[in-house]
Amino acid sequence: DKGLGFDPLVRRGLKYLNFYGEADKTGRNLAPDGVAATVLGSPVVQENGVQFTPAGTLLDTGILQSLDFTFFTIFNCPTLSQILLLSNFNGPRQSGSGTTQGVVLRTQPGSTSMTLNFSVNTLTGSTSTQRTVALGGLLANTNYLLCARFKSGQKMDFKILNKALSAEKTTDMGDPSDLGAKLRIGGSYQADLTNAGIHRFSALHTVALTDDEITKAATQWTAWANAVGVVL
């Protein structure tokens, strides 16, 4: 059991935690007092992860998006493809020109590499605006340990912790985040997007962790990956 006896070092705001690779444990929640997630569709379970594909196959955490949040994950795209890591599908309003709603953390495939996009709707009165931060150059068949953090009205950033890569946005961040939907892991919002990535583990905090807390948690996630043979 990839999560048996696991004791998280950083517990502040921790609402969801799971390690994937066993069919009957895909929706479980190892966070202190955590409530199990709802598995929708038929995830493809692999030895060290799970694929939520095609559209409609996802993990609904049941956790409402908060003003601040921090999300850790280890993922791998075997080919240059999309993987939807976190979203708040069926949110209160739509953003952009497509069907993306609310919070979206995903890769965007290119001809030779992928771009990681982190977008969050922010709200002034009745007007919703999408704030986005992105980083290119991600490769296929590579395990990435990622931390994405949103501090409402101040900043949004992410770090690929095992590759020393990061991107952030701190300007024009005065509006609060647009709330009202539950956060989901995996899935795809278009039927023709295969979302062909592998999720290794996920941890969701409903607070913006400090840099020190992120470093401590990352050390523990790295140790777990090493223990189960996920090469970072």
Can you describe what each PLM-predicted range is?
Residues 1-55, 70, 215-232:
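Extracytoplasmic low-complexity segments
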Residues 16-20, 70-78, 146-148, 185, ...:
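Short hydrophobic/aromatic patches on beta-strands that form ligand-binding or substrate-lining surfaces
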Residues 24-33, 51-117, 206-215:
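Extracellular glycan-recognition modules
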Residues 59-62, 131-137, 171-173:
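Beta-strand-rich interaction surfaces with strong enrichment in secreted/lumenal proteins
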Residues 78-81, 126, 152-157:
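Extended, low-complexity, turn-rich repeat/linker tracts enriched in Gly/Pro/Ser/Thr and Asp/Glu
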Residues 168-199:
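Flexible glycan-contacting loops in extracellular carbohydrate-active proteins
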